[in-house]
Every structure is written in C-alpha cells, then in structure tokens.
Amino acid sequence: MLEEIKKIQGINHNEFDSMINTWLEAAKLDLKGIGIVDTLIDTPNSLVQNAIITYVLSFLDVTNAELYANSYLLQKDVLRHTIEYIDESASPLVDSMGVSA
C-alpha cells in the first residue's frame, strides 16, 4: 500500500516512507480496535484496503485532510456494522446479530 499511497500523492522519493508506514500500522491497529477480523487487516480486501489508505491520506494530504478523515470514519462505521468483518470474540460490544451495544 505504501507505493500506492505515494503514487496517489505524487511522491517519487523515500523521505516520507517511515511516516507513511507508521500511519499504515496505526490504521490497522485502529481497525483491529473496533473488532475487524485479523485476516482482513493482514490481507485486506478492497474495502479494508481503501479504508486504510483513506486513513493515511487524512494525515498525509494536508489540503484534503478533513475530507479524508470524514471519509475514513464513514468507511470504518460501515465495516464495523458488517458482520462478515467483525471478530465477535474480540469485540464484546457486538452481539450475535452484529449489532453494537
């Protein structure tokens, strides 16, 4: 995802790689924190990957930071309310129907 983010932002050097990787890891931890299944975080499908990239862009793209931050929150909420994405054993606030308490 690092190279994809750099391409989106037109970054053609490695000066920000460490920071971008930090944000990538933070996004994964944030999704894990709401109970997203580990396998989808480790090997993301297009919805999870898009959420992770949007999270990073909310920090990297200063001009559009608020837009990306709001988009990430919406994407995260959709993932959190989709039962296939939730690890019920890791999220005690989700009942058997996938509904948050």
PLM-predicted stretches and their roles:
Residues 50-62:
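Short, hydrophobic/amphipathic alpha-helical patches that form generic packing surfaces
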Residues 58, 74, 81-85, 92:
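Exposed, low-complexity/repetitive linear segments and helix-based recognition motifs
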Residues 1-48, 84-101:
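Conserved short "hinge" loops at termini or chain/domain junctions
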Residues 62-81:
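C-terminal structural segments of small proteins and small subunits
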Residues 12-15, 60, 64:
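Short coil/turn residues that cap or connect secondary-structure elements
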